Structure formats: C-alpha cells, structure tokens
C-alpha cells in the first residue's frame, strides 16, 4: 500500500519525536466529505465536528490496562473473524504458525507476546525488492519482504496464531513534515484495541497515527479495505494544534 509521496499531506508544524508523543490534537479539513464520517472514532481517537468539512481529532497513545472508553459509549469487542484465519491473514498457515512460536514462546501474557511478535516482524522483514502487489500473510512469512501493508498483515496473522484477536488499521502516519498513507496492526488486549506498528517495532505507537478505518480483512479483496482512504486522497488538509 505504497501511494508514494505524491499523495502525502504536508503540515506546517514539525514533530521532533512523533512516536514518543502521548496526545496530539489535530484540525482536519476535507473537501467534499464529512471528516466525522471518514475518520474512525473510538477510545484512542476522538473526532468532533467543527463545521462544514472540518473536524478536530484528538489521538491518545495507549497501552493495555489504561481506562479508555469510546466517546459514543459503543463497545468494540472483537468478532470471531478477528481471531480466525482468512484468505489474506492465514494464521493457520504452517510457516506463519512456526514463525509465531519463535517469539516469546514460553510467555503467556498476551501483551508481551504481541510486542515480541511486533519486534520479530520488524527485525526479520526488509523493504528490498517489494512490489505493488498486496501480498498475503502466508506469502510474506516466506518472502519476508514488503512495505507497511505486508508488515501489518503478517503481524496480524502471527497474533491470531497465538490466540490474540488482531486486525489492520488504515490511515496516515507522520513522517518528516508530512503525513503518509499507511497501514498498521491493532491487537485486542484486555478490553482495548491497542495499536502496534511493525515498521517501527517500538512496542506500541504514539499519537502520530491518524486512523481512517480498520478491517479484519475477512472475505475482502485488498482494494475494498482501502476504499475509505482513496476517497480522501488529494482532498485532505491537516493542522497540528497541540502536542503532549
């Protein structure tokens, strides 16, 4: 899922340590659509309308055990499909299963396992020789090459292989003065979906990821998961208002 720099969203304010941030407040402007309907809202990201095509988005960095609730009070408990293998996230593939056992093999704590899997993907994978084709988790486990999409689906598959519900998140991430379209992983720990990014391998993320949508990729062609993103490309402005 590499759209290139041509689709990047530039911002005026620089972030010196984006992935160490605890909270960031953004103002987003979207031409021709309502950002409240486009950007995901939940315990880690609150989206509030500020008028026609404008919204304020507050993103919180979270870790398991923190008390956070969705602004609308709705539950986001994992579905069966968040734990089951499918055509893109083959958590029952022998290579995926074997790889999942290589990290934190004797550990039972789900968060420790998830972080170890994130680090495993980060350390094993390379971006050399990647193609524009969306690879499945089974293919990535064998090639160990790919961009953010391949990192995300492999980590999701490894987590499910260790009985941790997992899905992918699609949105934007800050990088050197601009936001790039990006994919990462979310794992369900305790009663909270916690984001992980295997391209970073930091044991969680800060507040510099803006989530548009999430998907367990069940029965979906890759293009279907990306539709909400394609609708905003070239139409989005982002302003960083406050950083903690």
Task: Give the residues covered by each predicted segment.
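Active-site rim recognition segments
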Residues: 74-79, 119, 123, 161-164, ...
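A short, charged
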Residues: 2-10, 17, 21, 86-102, ...
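Short capping/connector residues at structural and topological boundaries
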Residues: 88, 94, 145, 177, ...
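Active-site neighborhood of thiol-dependent amide/isopeptide-bond enzymes
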Residues: 106-183, 187, 204-207, 220, ...
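Acidic low-complexity segments
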Residues: 48-143
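Intrinsically disordered, low-complexity boundary segments flanking structured domains
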Residues: 10-16, 150, 196-201
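Short, glycine-/Ser/Thr-/acidic-enriched flexible segments
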Residues: 33, 62-66, 173, 192, ...
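Intrinsically disordered, low-complexity N-terminal segments that are enriched in acidic
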Residues: 1-71
